[in-house]
A protein has these predicted regions:
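A short, conserved, highly charged catalytic patch centered on acidic carboxylates
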Residues: 1-136, 144
Length: 147
């Protein structure tokens, strides 16, 4: 399997770079981002579940995403965080696997074969049976996001 590291210019559709930024929306995003970073800094000693519930999920919720913490899977496994179209939908659009910063289980651009990637692939296979709306899988250490 081969992975290609893309920069922001290659990843985003050129349309979005040309689109006018609405100041009010930018201010909301900036405020949410500052609160997210403050929560991360004050919670460095906490575990992944705490960081997902008290930093990442509130950040995404402030940006109007419908988040679900610890979505149950077959067996004992749980998706750390997921995003759906609405709060009652079982159709997940985004799966998020979180690892603590500097975790050996986290993916990097030089070390792709990691536990974080294996878990997201497992969750994808389990979800595709009943959910056809999955669009993205995100692996994060709360500072870096691999899509």
């Amino acid at each position: 399997m081969h992975f290609t590291l893309l920069n922001e210019k290659d990843f985003f559709n050129p349309y979005y770079r040309k689109k006018q930024i609405i100041q009010n929306e930018f201010d909301i995003f900036n405020k949410a981002l500052m609160q997210y970073l403050e929560r991360l800094e004050s919670s460095q000693s906490e575990n992944e579940d705490y960081l997902v519930a008290n930093a990442l999920s509130p950040f995404l919720t402030m940006l109007n995403f419908k988040t679900h913490i610890k979505t149950k899977q077959k067996g004992k496994s749980e998706i750390d965080l997921s995003i759906s179209k609405d709060e009652f939908s079982k159709d997940l659009e985004v799966l998020i696997e979180a690892k603590k910063p500097n975790s050996k289980e986290f993916i990097t651009h030089t070390k792709v074969n990691s536990k974080a990637l294996h878990e997201t692939i497992l969750y994808y296979f389990r979800n595709r049976e009943y959910s056809f709306s999955l669009k993205f899988i995100i692996i994060t250490d709360f500072y870096k996001f691999y899509i």
